[in-house]
Amino acid sequence: MKNIKSILLGFVLGTIATGIVVWNVMPGMMLEERLSPYSVDETVNKIKENAISKGWAVPSVKPLHKSILKHGGGKVEPVMLVNLCQPNHAFNILSEDDNKKISVFMPCTISVFQKSDGKTYIGNMNAGLLGSMFGGTVAEVMAEVSVEQQAFIEFAN
């Protein structure tokens, strides 16, 4: 009986420890950040050019910092949201009814922002990891998206 309690306690503690590690590590794996050698505007333009050259559309570039200020939130350093869409990838995911909820992650967004140090940074979601959480078609498509998006921002590596 004592051995069973010890095994059960070890299992529970191991599960809790694993949960704590995953909880603390996942944000760093899901969201990526890198320093850009260019200004905010130059970085946005490079990303747009690279995406378009690879068959992606750029539906919009939104100056989030201006919207925050306009609506009374105060002044923050520049934050630009570059919205990107590859129509075939979007179709392959959204043509399946069970995947329509994935539309909350669309269009793909790369952020370009300036921190208080005056430097420009690029932020993006790890599309491959996101896709693997859903499996199936979403995982297949998002694996491709991940590779393609890295090519848009390779100048900052």
Question: What label would you give each PLM region?
Answer:
Residues 54-59, 64-108:
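Compact, glycine-rich, soluble single-domain proteins
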Residues 1-2:
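N-terminal hydrophobic targeting signals that begin at the initiator methionine
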Residues 6-24:
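Hydrophobic membrane-insertion alpha-helices, especially the h-region
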